[in-house]
Amino acid sequence: MKIFLYNCFILILLPAMAVRIVFKSLKDKDYRKYFSHRLGIYKDIKSLNKPIWFHAVSLGEVISSKRIVSDLLKNNEVILTVSTPTGLREAKKIYGDNLTVVYSPWDLIFFVAKFFKKFNPVALIIFETEIWPSMIYVSSKNNIPIILSNARLSQTSFRSYMRFKFFVLDTLNKFSLILAQSDQHLDRFRRMGVPINKIKKVGSVKFDIKIKR
């Protein structure tokens, strides 16, 4: 029921989200380029062989996650999703043809399900604190590991999440593993109600992962 209400809310916002893209494209035409990706339509992208889905929202996260993504690429197919043109351009600049980079679908179950149908990812790694309920819900329904890497939870975000704990905790508990940046961030996730056995302090963006295919 909670995820249904959330999707109804996002559906109401959809026209405004589309208008926002139009206005932003006046300054940066790449906002409207590949617009179909935001709807979960990737006809211009070739299918992959059970890739790891790595989500880094924007330019800063793309740069910070370079070490992890490069390590993953050594032994895995990876698809990187971003939300901004600057992130898209930087990722293409860094990885070239070695990595598939696309816009992430808007956070509606229908759009995310279309992404899964196209790419069939075997794991989802979200960088830092991009907590998208539909993305995580559909991943959970597909029984794949969901990892929050380099996770941080500021005091401001913590207070906001606590106000909606009844909903946020449902999403957080779907993570298989949360790799926190520090003891402070780890403690905030714990106080949110995430089981302590799902949270680890790593202190670095580098980690090893093995995926069963």
Question: Which functions belong to the PLM regions below?
Answer:
Residues A18-I211:
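Active-site and donor-binding regions of nucleotide-sugar-utilizing enzymes
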Residues M1-K2, F164:
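Absolute protein N-terminus
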Residues K2-F9, L13-F23:
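Membrane-interacting alpha-helical segments
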